[in-house]
C-alpha cells in the first residue's frame, strides 16, 4: 500500500477508538474537549464551543491576516531560536540539518520530512539516535505542492521543517504522546504567546517512508502550525504492518508558518525571505495592491489543489466573495504568484544543488529542472528584466546568513548557465511543435498538456502564448508529478540460503592472505558451495568477486545472499566433501583492490577538478579496468579528463595510507558527514569506512590497497555522458595502465615509421594529409559535376520524347545542380535521371510522380516534377 492507502485504511479505526490512539488525558487536562467537524467529519479538540474544525476549508479561510495573535512579531530564524530555547528545559538537543539529497535512505531521493533524517535505521531501532530527544531545522523538498506555491500563502517546494523527535524503546522511555502534546502546547502559548483558546488540535493519521501512526495537527485561525505524529507502526513488504520497536514522536512544522502567523502579512513568503522579495519587487517593478492582497489572502487557504476536488468551483466562490470577475481575479493573483514562485523555486534549487543534486531529465533531477524552467517561463511570460542568478545571490546573502554553508556555492552559476542554454534550445523546438499542433487544430486536453510537458518539456505558459484560449488545469504540476511518484512494490523473496548460518568473511581481516582451510556447510547444488568461512570476496559494491580454486576445482563466481557466501564452481564438487582448501587468484585480487582504491582516488580528483557537486552515481571494478559514474552537468573536455588524471596520480604518489575504520553509523555520520554515502545507502549498524586522510572518506565494503602508492599509475581512458547529469569515467591502474600507455605508444611508433616523421611532427603531418585529402575531394567533386553535365547533355541530345538514363558517380546535390542548367530543354518531354538510390523526374506527357513510385519507396513532388529516394528491390 502507498501512504494514501494506509491513511484511508486507518482513519476510521483511529477515529472510532480515539481514546486508544490520541493523547486524550493531556488534552483534557489542558481544558480541551472533543468535537466532530460538521463539515469534514474529523475529530478535533477545542477550549471553546465550535461546530467546525480549523481547516481553512471548514472554518472560512485564514483569520489571522492583519491580526496580532502572538506576544511579538517573530522573524524567520528568531522563531526557531525561540523554539530551541523553549525545548531545552526538557533536555532536547538541537541538531544541524541533514543534506536534502537522501543518500543514506534508498527509498527516497530527497528529504521530504524531518523524520527522514532518522530513517530507516534509527526509527527501526537498529542503531542509536544522536540523542533521545532532538530538534532540527531540516530543509525539505516537496514537489507535489508546485501548483499551490504563491496561491495558498503557506506552500513551498523547499521549506524548513522544524523537528521534534523522541525515540522510545522498551528499555528507555523518553517522551511520547501525552508528554509531547503538552510540550507543544507550552511552546505555542508561552514561546510564541498564542492564547490557548485560539489553538485547535485535529486528529489525523500520518504515513510516510514506510512508517505510520496517529497524529495531532495544531491550528490557529485557519492555519495549520504543525503536526505531531506518534510513529508506532511500520509497513511490511507483503503489505501488512507491525509495531515498531522504537516508538517515535515525529513533530513537523513549517517554520515559515510560525513567522507568517506572528506577522499577519498576506503571504508567508514576505516573512520568510523579505530581502529577496524586496529585490524581486524592485526588479519586476510590480507590487500587489495591499488592500486587494490582504482581502484575497483570507480566502487563499481554501485554494489548495491537493485538498479540494473541484478547484474551478473554489476559485468561483472566492471571486464571488470578493465581488470580482474571475478572469480579473486570476490575472492579479497569478502575477503576484509568479514573483513568489521565483523566490521559492530558486531557494529550493540553491539548497538542492549545493547538496549535490543536479537538474536533469531523470530521477530527482527532473523535479529541479521543472522548477528552473518554470522560473524562466514565468519571466518570459511577464517580460520581466530579471536574472535568476541575481535572485540566487540574494538568497545566498539572506538565507546564507543562517545556513552559512550556502555561501560556498561551488559551480552553481555554471550549472544554471548550462541549463539556460538547454532551456532556450528546448523553447525553440517547442514553438515549432506548438505551431504544427495549432495549424493541425489538435485538441489540447489536460492529459495532452501534461504529456507535452513531461515528454517534450513544453511548458503550459509557452502553450498559452501561442494559443490563449487553451485551459491550463489549476493542478497542472501536481498531475505532472503524479507521473513520477509511482513506486515499485516490494516483494518478499524466498532465497536459497534460508536457514543457513552466516559465512565468516576472512578477507577483511586477512586481505593479503590467499590460501585457507574451511568446512563445508552445504552444497546447494553440485556446483554451488557454502563454507563456514572464506577468503573469497563476493561480488559487491561494484567490485567483481574473486576467482580461484577449491580442492582444485575452479571457482568462477562468488556472491553473497543474506550474509551467506556462495561459491560457484566450474565443475561439480563430490557430495561427501566435508573440508576444503581454498586458494584465491592473487594476481586478480591485487588488480581488483588497486582498481577499487583507484576509484576512490579518481572520485576525489573529479571533485577537486569539477567541483563539490560531484558525487558517485555508480561504479564497477573488474580485472581489466574500472569505471566511475559521477554527477556532472555537462560532458567533460579532454583537458578536464587530463587534469583529473594528473590530480589522481598526484595523490597516488603522495603515499597516503588507506585506512579501514569500523564505526557505528551515528559516529561515522557525525565525524565525516553524509559524504560517506558516495555509493548510496549502506545497510547495517556498523559501517566500514575507507579513509584516505585529508582527501576522501567513504563507507565501502570493498577490498583496498593499504597505501595510495600501491595503485600504481592511473591512466584515464575516456569520459562519456551516459545520461542527463551523469558522466562515466573509465580508467586503469597498475600493470593494466602501463599496458594501455605502451599500446598507445606502439600506435604512435607505427604511424611515425609509416610517415617517416618524429612523434612531435605527427599532428602537423596528419593535418597536411587531411588538407590534401580535402583538396582532392574538392577536385573529385568538380570532376563529378562535369561528368554529370556531359551525361545529361548527351542524353538530351538524342531524338525522342522520353529520356531515362542512369547518372553514375554523383550524389543527389550534384545531380540537382546540373539539372537546373538544362531545365529549358525538358519541355514537351519525359525526363528521368537515376542515381545511386535516388532519382529525379520531369514530364509534360505523363504523371512522373506515379512513374517514379513504381521503382522507389519515397516520392515527393507533383505529377510534372518529382524526386524519389530508396529504390525498391527488383523482383
UniProtKB/Swiss-Prot annotation:
Record organism: Methanocella arvoryzae (strain DSM 22066 / NBRC 105507 / MRE50)
HAMAP family in the cross-refs: Ala_tRNA_synth_A
Co-factor binding details: Binds 1 zinc ion per subunit.
Entry's localization field: Cytoplasm
Description of its domains: Consists of three domains; the N-terminal catalytic domain, the editing domain and the C-terminal C-Ala domain. The editing domain removes incorrectly charged amino acids, while the C-Ala domain, along with tRNA(Ala), serves as a bridge to cooperatively bring together the editing and aminoacylation centers thus stimulating deacylation of misacylated tRNAs.
Function: Catalyzes the attachment of alanine to tRNA(Ala) in a two-step reaction: alanine is first activated by ATP to form Ala-AMP and then transferred to the acceptor end of tRNA(Ala). Also edits incorrectly charged Ser-tRNA(Ala) and Gly-tRNA(Ala) via its editing domain.
Domain of life: Archaea
The protein, known as: Alanine--tRNA ligase
InterPro entries per record: aa-tRNA-synth_II/BPL/LPL, Ala-tRNA-lgiase_IIc, Ala-tRNA-ligase_IIc_anticod-bd, Ala-tRNA-synth_IIc_core, Ala-tRNA-synth_IIc_N, Ala-tRNA_lgiase_arc, Ala-tRNA_ligase, Thr/Ala-tRNA-synth_IIc_edit
GO (cellular component) term, any one: cytoplasm
Amino acid at each position: 500500500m502507498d501512504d494514501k492507502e494506509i491513511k484511508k485504511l486507518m482513519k476510521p479505526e483511529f477515529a472510532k477508538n480515539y481514546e486508544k490512539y490520541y493523547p486524550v488525558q493531556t488534552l483534557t487536562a489542558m481544558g480541551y474537549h472533543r468535537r466532530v467537524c460538521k463539515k469534514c467529519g474529523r475529530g478535533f479538540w477545542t477550549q471553546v464551543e465550535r461546530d467546525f474544525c480549523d481547516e481553512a476549508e471548514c472554518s472560512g479561510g485564514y483569520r489571522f491576516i492583519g491580526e496580532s495573535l502572538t506576544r511579538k512579531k517573530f522573524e524567520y530564524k528568531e522563531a526557531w531560536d525561540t523554539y530551541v530555547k523553549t525545548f531545552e528545559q526538557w533536555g532536547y538537543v538541537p541538531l544541524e540539518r541533514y543534506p536534502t539529497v537522501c543518500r543514506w535512505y534508498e527509498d527516497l531521493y530527497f528529504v521530504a520530512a524531518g523524520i527522514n533524517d532518522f530513517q530507516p535505521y534509527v526509527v527501526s531501532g537498529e542503531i542509536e539516535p544522536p540523542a533521545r530527544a532532538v530538534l532540527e531545522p531540516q530543509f525539505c523538498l516537496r514537489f507535489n505542492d508546485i501548483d499551490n506555491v504563491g496561491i495558498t500563502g503557506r506552500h513551498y517546494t523547499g521549506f524548513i521543517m522544524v523537528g521534534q523527535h523522541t525515540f522510545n524503546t522498551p528499555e528507555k522511555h523518553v517522551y511520547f504522546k501525552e508528554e509531547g502534546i503538552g510540550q507543544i502546547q507550552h511552546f505555542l502559548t508561552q514561546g510564541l504567546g498564542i492564547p490557548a483558546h485560539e489553538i485547535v488540535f485535529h486528529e489525523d493519521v500520518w504515513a510516510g517512508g514506510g512508517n505510520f501512526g496517529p497524529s495531532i495537527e495544531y491550528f490557529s485561525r485557519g492555519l495549520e502550525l504543525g503536526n505531531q505524529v506518534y510513529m508506532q507502526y511500520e509497513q511490511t513488504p507483503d503489505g501488512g504492518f507491525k509495531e515498531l520497536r522504537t516508538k517515535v514522536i515525529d513533530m513537523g512544522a513549517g517554520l515559515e508558518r510560525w513567522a507568517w502567523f506572528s506577522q499577519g502579512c498576506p503571504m508567508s513568503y514576505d516573512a520568510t525571505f523579505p530581502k529577496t522579495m524586496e529585490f524581486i519587487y524592485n526588479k519586476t517593478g510590480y507590487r500587489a495592491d495591499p488592500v486587494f492582497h490582504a482581502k484575497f489572502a483570507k480566502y487563499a487557504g481554501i485554494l489548495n489543489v491537493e485538498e479540494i476536488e473541484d478547484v474551478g468551483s473554489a476559485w468561483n466562490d472566492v471571486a464571488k466573495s470578493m465581488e470580482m470577475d474571475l478572469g480579473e481575479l486570476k490575472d492579479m493573483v497569478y502575477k503576484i504568484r509568479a514573483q513568489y514562485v521565483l523566490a521559492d523555486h530558486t531557494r529550493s534549487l540553491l539548497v538542492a544543488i549545493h547538496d549535490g543534486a543536479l537538474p536533469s531529465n531523470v530521477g530527482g533531477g527532473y523535479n529541479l529542472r521543472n522548477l528552473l524552467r518554470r522560473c524562466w517561463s514565468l519571466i518570459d511570460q511577464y517580460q520581466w528584466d530579471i536574472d535568476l542568478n541575481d535572485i540566487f545571490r540574494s538568497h545566498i546573502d539572506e538565507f546564507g546568513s543562517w545556513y552559512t554553508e550556502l555561501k560556498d556555492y561551488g559551480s552553481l552559476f555554471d550549472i544554471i548557465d548550462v541549463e539556460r542554454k538547454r532551456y532556450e534550445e528546448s523553447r525553440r523546438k517547442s514553438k515549432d511543435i506548438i505551431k504544427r499542433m495549432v495549424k493541425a487544430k489538435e485538441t489540447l486536453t489536460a492529459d495532452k498538456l501534461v504529456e507535452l510537458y513531461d515528454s517534450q518539456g513544453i511548458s503550459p505558459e509557452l502553450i498559452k502564448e501561442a494559443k490563449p484560449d487553451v485551459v491550463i488545469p489549476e493542478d497542472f504540476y501536481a498531475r505532472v508529478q503524479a507521473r513520477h511518484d509511482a513506486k515499485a512494490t516490494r516483494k518478499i523473496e524466498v532465497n536459497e540460503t534460508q536457514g543457513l548460518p552466516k559465512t565468516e568473511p576472512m578477507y577483511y581481516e586477512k586481505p593479503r592472505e590467499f590460501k585457507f582451510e574451511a568446512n563445508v556447510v552445504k552444497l546447494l547444488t553440485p556446483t554451488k558451495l557454502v563454507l563456514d568461512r572464506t577468503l573469497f570476496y563476493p561480488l559487491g559494491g561494484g567490485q567483481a568477486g574473486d576467482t580461484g580454486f577449491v580442492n582444485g576445482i575452479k571457482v568462477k563466481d562468488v556472491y553473497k545472499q543474506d550474509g551467506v557466501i556462495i561459491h560457484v564452481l566450474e565443475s561439480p564438487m563430490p557430495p561427501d566433501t566435508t573440508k576444503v582448501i581454498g586458494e584465491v587468484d592473487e594476481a586478480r585480487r591485487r588488480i581488483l583492490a588497486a582498481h577499487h582504491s583507484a576509484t576512490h582516488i579518481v572520485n576525489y580528483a573529479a571533485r577537486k577538478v569539477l567541483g563539490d557537486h560531484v558525487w558517485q552515481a555508480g561504479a564497477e571494478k573488474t580485472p581489466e579496468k574500472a569505471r566511475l559514474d559521477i554527477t556532472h552537468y555537462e560532458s567533460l573536455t579532454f583537458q578536464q579528463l587530463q587534469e583529473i588524471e594528473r590530480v589522481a596520480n598526484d595523490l597516488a604518489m603522495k603515499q597516503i595510507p588507506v585506512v579501514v575504520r569500523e564505526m557505528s553509523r551515528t559516529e561515522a555520520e557525525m565525524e565525516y558527514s553524509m559524504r560517506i554515502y558516495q555509493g548510496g545507502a549502506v545497510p547495517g549498524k556498523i559501517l566500514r569506512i575507507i579513509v584516505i586522510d585529508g582527501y576522501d572518506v567513504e563507507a565501502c565494503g570493498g577490498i583496498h590497497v593499504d597505501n595510495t602508492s600501491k595503485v600504481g599509475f592511473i591512466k584515464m581512458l575516456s569520459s562519456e555522458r551516459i545520461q542527463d547529469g551523469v558522466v562515466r569515467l573509465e580508467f586503469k591502474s597498475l600493470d593494466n595502465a602501463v599496458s594501455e600507455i605502451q599500446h598507445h605508444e606502439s600506435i604512435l611508433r607505427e604511424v611515425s615509421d609509416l610517415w617517416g616523421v618524429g612523434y612531435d611532427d605527427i599532428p602537423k603531418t596528419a593535418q597536411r594529409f587531411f588538407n590534401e585529402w580535402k583538396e582532392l575531394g574538392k577536385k573529385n567533386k568538380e570532376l563529378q559535376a562535369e561528368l554529370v553535365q556531359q551525361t545529361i547533355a548527351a542524353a538530351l541530345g538524342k531524338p525522342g520524347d522520353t529520356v531515362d538514363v542512369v547518372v553514375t558517380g554523383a550524389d543527389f546535390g550534384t545531380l540537382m545542380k546540373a539539372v537546373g542548367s538544362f531545365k529549358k530543354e525538358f519541355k514537351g518531354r519525359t525526363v528521368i535521371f537515376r542515381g545511386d538510390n535516388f532519382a529525379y523526374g520531369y514530364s509534360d506527357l505523363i504523371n512522373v510522380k506515379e512513374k517514379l513510385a513504381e521503382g522507389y519507396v519515397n516520392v515527393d513532388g507533383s505529377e510534372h516534377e518529382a524526386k524519389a529516394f530508396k529504390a525498391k528491390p527488383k523482383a
